[in-house]
Amino acid sequence: MSAPRRELAGGTRGAVYVEFLIAFLPLFSFFLCLVQLAMLQTANLIVKHAAVVAARAAVVILPDDPDRYGGANINRAEGARREKIVQAATIPLSTLEDIPFPEVRFPTDEGGDDDRVVFGRDDLVRVQVNQLYRCRVPLARTIVCGAFFGLKRLRGEASLPNQGAGYGYE
């Protein structure tokens, strides 16, 4: 082996660069995961807020005057009344997606998957809002949100008593 080659084989030039690359990639990945996790938790709070907004809208809309909803029956979550409640849930979710498509249900029990339609006076109106959230941070979306296209299903639930009017509309 010639003298210049022996010098290159025993040299330490570039060691700092290699050490930097070894330390940088895990730290940068960790930073990206923290950013994605912060965005995911912010979206989770927005979905929970959308559930509260939908519950507040439901206790106002369900016992409201039938003439405002095309003659739909009072205290029934269907037709125009349901559309207005879904619209109320969609407004806060528009900060997450350009055109959000929330799934709004009225479960009978907390965390339930049924969809109640008829409510009586003083019944508890429970609203559940489900929204698919698209994780967008490169590399971190597969780690934080899973490998399924970077989508995470977020769920918010809120309930309020139905304190509808004790009189009839004429």
Predicted feature residues:
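Short, conserved structural patches
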Residues: S2-A3, A57-E170
